Amino acid sequence: MMDIFLAILPAIFWGSIVLFNVKLGGGPYSQTLGTTFGALIFSIVVYIFMKPVLTPTVIGVGVVSGLFWALGQANQLKSIDLMGVSRTMPISTGLQLVATTLFGVIVFHEWSTTISVVLGILALVCIIIGVILTSLQSEEEKNAEQAANFKRGIVILLISTVGYLVYVVVIRLFNVDGWSALLPQAVGMVLGGILLTFKHHPFNKYAIRNIIPGLIWAAGNMFLFISQPRVGVATSFSLSQMGIIISTLGGILILGEKKTKRQLTGIVVGIVFIIAAGIMLGIAKS
């Protein structure tokens, strides 16, 4: 039971990050910068206690991974600014699952059995259905301005997905240990955060406030590393997708994002489809 609890913690931590970002304020640029500094602080503390070996490869790969994480996070927060948390997060999660899955299949040949192929295809279908259901628009949102924001938000999310994809796969391509990559990743995140935001004057009180989400993100990362050897990569991957419940429903219940009954139904059912897809992909990976 304790092992499963540890495996659920990343979902709880990561699912709450955007809620903290929005509540703490400051816009996407200050939020991005503050989050990266929070991750760096946490990673320095972990490094002091864990003392992982840092080779040139680990440092280089970790920094590149962190740079692309910053690209993913900054654009996800921009999309949230346009579309809201409860709409952005299910779509973002779905796009990330599709991207990482297809990359895993094409490059790493993850679906090696008939069962994994069937489960994988079913999962991708579930993701598409889930994303469509969570994207339902109300009549008010069909006006020109809202429609333009939605289209722009989707394009920005595609860029975000590329960032998150490279952040994940570059570590795997070079077979770098997660604990070893943690500090170089955080350095890359800060560098990426500065490069992406400095033109927008993000160094303010909101950036300092948003150090908190960065600490939360890094804590979630740490618990993922702890839980994977205990429950396996497949289970930890599946459980980590549950964060979508916290972020999406939190956007509605905590941040007060308004939804029609039709949209609420679509969001709930869509989340179920995306979570089911995450579980199936976890099984297909095992």
UniProtKB/Swiss-Prot annotation:
Q: What is this protein called?
A: Probable glucose uptake protein GlcU
Parts of the chain that traverse the membrane: 4-22, 27-49, 53-72, 85-107, 111-133, 154-176, 181-198, 211-228, 233-255, 267-284
**What keywords were assigned to this record?**
Cell membrane, Membrane, Sugar transport, Transmembrane, Transmembrane helix, Transport
The annotated topology with respect to the bilayer is: Multi-pass membrane protein
MF terms from GO for this chain are: carbohydrate transmembrane transporter activity
Family membership: Belongs to the GRP transporter (TC 2.A.7.5) family.
Record's superkingdom? Answer: Bacteria
GO CC annotation: what is one?
plasma membrane
**Matches recorded under Pfam families:** Sugar_transport (PF06800)
InterPro entries membership = Sugar_transport
Q: Where does it localize?
A: Cell membrane
The protein's matches in NCBIfam families, at most eight in alphabetical order, are given as:
RhaT
Q: Does the keyword Cytoplasm apply?
A: no
Q: Which organism is it from?
A: Bacillus cereus (strain ATCC 14579 / DSM 31 / CCUG 7414 / JCM 2152 / NBRC 15305 / NCIMB 9373 / NCTC 2599 / NRRL B-3711)
This molecule's function is given as:
Involved in the uptake of glucose.
- Record CDD domains: glucose_uptake_GlcU (cd23112)
